[in-house]
Amino acid sequence: MLVAAIATVIVLAHLGAQQHRCTQEVTNFSILIDGTEGHNLIDEAAMHRWFKAHGVHPDGLTLDEVNLAELESVAMEHSAVSRANAYMTHAGYVEMNIVQREPIMRFKVDGYDHYVARDGHIFKAMGGYAAYVPVVTGNYKPLFTRDFAGSFDEFIEDSIASMHREIGHCEQLKYPIYRDKNKANSRLKSVRDSVIYKSWFMSEEKHAALVANLELFKEAFAKRKTEEIGKYDKQLASLEKRQERLYDNITAVNKRKGDFENLEKFVNYILRDSFWGAEITQVIISESRAGDMLIKLVPRSGGFVIDFGEVERIEDKFDALSRFYSSVLRSVGWDAYREISVRYDGQVVCREAIKRDGDNSDNNKS
């Protein structure tokens, strides 16, 4: 009897809760957005508009009609959202906690305007919202397309895998060509090796005529087969060149992937330092004759540009730059130079901002 009573209570409680969910309307939908200071890419109003645009906003629904998993899924479709967790209360409150992605740099090159997040996720900049991170400009062209949003690493892996698949497809196309070429060579060899033997009762004249006809046939056959084999060779050469281009493209993609990773490493180094994180506003990228990535920096202070050179010896270069800031710039003034270079090992090279007594030479400062 006790077990039956407990079971009845449980069933009634469940039915009551279900009835409540079916009648209780959503009384409030609040969105809490967690993000790093200075990186406000979205706000609560923007996310409310996002949910309404996707037809999943819970206003006017009962608790039973609210699909929390769908709400979270739609939130994650927003490129600036890293994590989303939704829940509801008995009183009709639906609440969602959202964690924003943390941008580390912003590409503004060749029609691109994209953020790169700390987790490697890439997404387009959104009107009305901005993160205070270094802006990357110059002649650097990103590997991803202008409409791309997603993981950079996954994009590279997919791109390289696609090229490897195409290389494999080219290899498969070679097999029937090799087969037909080998058949043609075998047939050509067979005809070239063929002879007509003189029988006991065959006259010399008839044998000579047969041999002459055979030679004419061999010549014509060899011409046809040689042309056929030449076509096979051209097809194979075309496929091999296609594979070579794909291998070259893979090498180029890996090189540019390395450049991108070095750029991430470089920017992360800047952002970890409270002074340089606030001082560096722009990263200008160019390319050396050897194809190496070169960097110039635009600081917030002064009217000069910092020629950083290749992304190497990062800590040493910034140490030299810090000493120069402290020992030289504070003495001569922030507008004394138009360019400060730390690309050369062990020294800081400066170009004066103003001609002095007709001298426009470089000045070396250690």
Predicted features along the sequence, with ranges:
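Lipid-handling modules and contact-site tethers
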Residues: 42
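Structural beta->alpha junctions
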Residues: 33-39
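Charged, solvent-exposed interaction patches on well-folded alpha/beta domains
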Residues: 1-33, 45, 51-77, 82-366
